Amino acid sequence: AIARLLWDCGRQDPFADPPGDWPARLAPLATDADLPPLSRAMATIPLLALHVPHSFQADQPTRRAVAATLLRQNAALLVARRPAGPVHRPLREAWRPGGAGFAELVRAALVLCADHELNVSAFAARVVASTGAHLHATVCAGLAALSGPRHGGATARAYALVEGARESTDTERFIAQRWRPG
């Protein structure tokens, strides 16, 4: 419902049709849980574009339907699953199967992230979109920016710092060494 509101869909529901399964040649890549999620998405999404007409040359309802499918596919790529239903469901099934309450927490987090100002990845995606590029190329630009160590990559670095500090016998010394210049 939030995407429909942000996309100004009116009565159209671009999520009405099920997203379908992965194309046969892409299924092994899209569901390879040994690949890091961002790498899996960056490798698969450009190839998915081969199966979709140029999204910016289509009418508005078609563009929204392409975007809805791509949104579901992107979520499925995050957890190496097949695209399905609302975006929060495959995430819940991968992270905490059967956790209905957890599903609502995931959905709420996604709602909070839906319109989150202009960060680096959103800016990169908007620049690419402004050229009339395929929607899949636009998403790839955002993901490429997200992969940088000063944007999405910072999360992995922060997690490693917290884990290292938790495992250290001298937390203050560990953090001081990590933050020392050079």
Language model region names:
Residues 1-182:
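Hydrophobic alpha-helical bundle cores within soluble ligand-binding/oligomerization subdomains
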